[in-house]
Curated annotation (Swiss-Prot):
Organism: Chlamydia caviae (strain ATCC VR-813 / DSM 19441 / 03DC25 / GPIC) (Chlamydophila caviae)
GO molecular function, one term: uracil DNA N-glycosylase activity
Chief location: cytoplasm
Gene Ontology, cellular component aspect: cytoplasm
Active-site feature positions: D70
E.C. number: 3.2.2.27
Protein name: Uracil-DNA glycosylase
Gene name linked to the record: ung
Protein family: Belongs to the uracil-DNA glycosylase (UDG) superfamily. UNG family.
Function field: Excises uracil residues from the DNA which can arise as a result of misincorporation of dUMP residues by DNA polymerase or due to deamination of cytosine.
InterPro entries referenced in this protein's UniProt entry, alphabetically: UDG_fam1, Ura-DNA_Glyclase_AS, Uracil-DNA_glycosylase-like, Uracil-DNA_glycosylase-like_sf
SUPFAM superfamilies named in the record: Uracil-DNA glycosylase-like
NCBIfam families: PRK05254.1-1, PRK05254.1-2, PRK05254.1-4, PRK05254.1-5, ung
Localization in the cell: Cytoplasm
Length: 229
């Protein structure tokens, strides 16, 4: 576990922003917890994929943040990017709804669930909790990940400008309470969660994908190509 959970796993830009977190007491406890969990039970994602979101989207490249909750708990689903699944894996219900809204909004139809190309374009696909015990949603909540991802969000709020934060659901909104005091620096898009339980309460019809590209165009930044390869 040790090699997979060191700061040198991250791009240099994230190392610079998060280096003080690695020495915090909560991180020491989190490392011990993860070492125990990975050695005694099945945990997702694989150790090498825990920090895929940060590896894929360096700090200075972040243009959009889409916050998730915790990884998918099913075999072969989680690979370190929120809402995403590896190539060839059946689409989970929330991702089906995300793609449904994308098609309604921009006429783009995606059939593969791997969102890596979004991450490569500057969309940080970050879960609030980065690991989960197999078959048990939220099983790694309250172990320290929330503090770590709070630090990620805080660094973006404080040290970057004109980032578009996409908050789907109450958990994401609560996570970004700080944003509502710094909205002059950043853009905020909110909607209900895309899960089947909530999507009909306002996620469908939110038009977030076109709104993101409209905001990027206003900032003279390249728009996101939402069509997956």
């Amino acid at each position: 576990m040790q090699n997979a959970f060191t700061i040198d796993q991250l791009p240099l830009s994230w190392q610079e922003q998060l280096k003080t977190e690695w020495s915090q007491p909560y991180m020491h406890k989190l490392r011990e917890f993860l070492q125990s969990e990975y050695s005694q039970t099945t945990v997702f994602p694989a150790k090498d994929n825990i920090f895929t979101a940060l590896k894929s989207t360096p700090f200075d490249s972040v243009r959009v943040v889409i916050l998730g909750q915790d990884p998918y708990p099913g075999e072969g689903q989680a690979h370190g990017l929120s809402f995403s699944v590896p190539q060839g894996v059946r689409l989970p219900p929330s991702l089906i709804n995300i793609f449904r809204e994308l098609q309604t909004d921009l006429g783009i139809e995606n059939t593969t669930g791997c969102l890596q190309s979004w991450a490569d374009q500057g969309v940080l696909l970050l879960n609030t909790v980065l690991t989960v015990r197999a078959g048990t949603p939220f099983s790694h909540a309250g172990q320290g990940w929330e503090q770590f991802t709070d630090a990620i969000v805080t660094k973006l709020i404080e040290n970057r400008s004109h980032v578009i934060f996409v908050l789907w659901g109450n958990a994401a909104r609560k996570k970004c309470d700080l944003l509502f005091h710094s909205s002059h620096k950043h853009a905020i898009l909110t909607a209900p969660h895309p899960s089947p339980l909530a999507a009909h309460r306002g996620f469908f019809g939110c038009s977030h994908f076109s709104k993101i590209n409209y905001l990027l165009k206003k900032l003279n930044k390249p728009m996101i190509n939402w069509k997956l390869p």
